[in-house]
């Protein structure tokens, strides 16, 4: 509902999409992940874009686990799995072990939807992400989505979440440079997230070459999340990550929607103010404009990867 009011997109995640939300199709990105939960033709047709999720910034290289206690009622129906059964997402897609395999899935999804939907591929920000992105750009995908280190999740081991992956800024800059060097940057859009916590992070990402950004944890906090870090227990005190009826009632959808609209609207105003201070009057003029950025506390290699100068230069 907030996406509809703001004119932006929201992502279903890997758990499918309940039919009640089909009315928001013009603002929906449907996701196809390794578990393929809830994926069928009507689901693919329900959104404006299809995202193939290969990796996630908070847990590169591993899958996911939704406890059986959360698989009840509509969740069971939407994911198309039995009530009470654990939902296990494998680490890899078992039909994707090469760029050629990825290309086959990309074009299978395009064909299934009449070549009407753009296809995005989401990967985690890791050390070889530039090479991975180069392959994705050649697979026929329309959008490359990069998820950075410190992105949020309710289903990742602490040691993986806190120690695996690289910051989204370094991943974005290296991917943008690699695609430009190979002359294929114009073939795809770059969308980034993972540690996008405020409007300044959005400005930095666009200046480093992103076409768009997405948020998750910031949106949850706007809706009332208090970062209890107990999503996996299924007993969220704020009614967000739970299926317990008494707890679900604590989340007021209308209030959450209004707060999320306020957040994105405020960020939009702040971005305009920062752009005005730079003498830039359009987001297009900011995209890839590294002249607007300076590094503080970064070493020479990091500055080289980012393609920016140190403060004072």
Ranges and model annotations:
Residues 1-94, 101-103, 258, 262, ...:
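N-terminal capping/small domains of soluble enzymes
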Residues 33-48, 170-178, 237-250, 310-313:
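Short, basic, helix/turn surface patches
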Residues 12, 28, 78, 113, ...:
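Residue-identity detector for threonine
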Residues 197-200, 206-312:
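Gly/Ser/Thr/Ala-enriched C-terminal appendages of enzymes
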Residues 80-83, 87, 114, 122, ...:
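A generic structural signal for ordered alpha-helices
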Residues 19, 90-248:
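Glycine-rich phosphate/ribose-binding loops and adjacent secondary-structure elements
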């Amino acid at each position: 509902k907030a996406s509809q009011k703001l004119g932006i997109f929201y992502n279903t995640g890997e758990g499918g999409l309940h039919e009640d939300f089909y009315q928001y199709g013009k603002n929906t990105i449907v996701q196809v992940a390794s578990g393929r939960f809830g994926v069928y033709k009507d689901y693919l047709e329900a959104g404006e874009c299809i995202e193939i999720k290969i990796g996630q910034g908070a847990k590169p290289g591993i899958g996911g686990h939704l406890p059986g206690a959360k698989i009840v009622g509509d969740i069971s129906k939407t994911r198309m799995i039995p009530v009470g059964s654990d939902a296990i997402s494998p680490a890899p897609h078992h039909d994707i072990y090469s760029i050629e395999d990825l290309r086959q899935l990309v074009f299978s999804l395009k064909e299934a939807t009449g070549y009407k939907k753009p296809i995005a591929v989401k990967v985690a920000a890791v050390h070889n992400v530039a090479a991975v992105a180069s392959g994705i750009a050649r697979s026929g995908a329309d959008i490359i989505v990069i998820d950075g280190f410190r992105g949020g999740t309710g289903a990742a081991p602490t040691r993986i979440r806190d120690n695996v992956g690289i910051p989204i800024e370094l991943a974005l800059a290296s991917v943008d440079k690699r695609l430009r060097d190979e002359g294929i940057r114009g073939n795809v859009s770059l969308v980034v997230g993972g540690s996008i916590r405020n409007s300044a992070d959005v400005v930095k990402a666009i200046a480093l070459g992103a076409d768009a950004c997405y948020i998750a944890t910031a949106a949850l906090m706007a809706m009332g999340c208090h970062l209890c870090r107990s999503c996996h227990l299924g007993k969220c005190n704020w009614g967000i990550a739970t299926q317990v009826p008494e707890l679900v009632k604590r989340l007021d959808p209308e209030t959450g929607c209004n707060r999320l609209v306020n957040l994105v609207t405020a960020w939009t105003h702040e971005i305009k103010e920062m752009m005005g201070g730079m003498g830039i009057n359009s987001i297009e003029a900011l995209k890839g404009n590294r002249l607007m950025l300076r590094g503080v506390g970064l070493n020479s290699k990091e500055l080289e990867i980012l393609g920016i100068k140190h403060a004072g230069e």
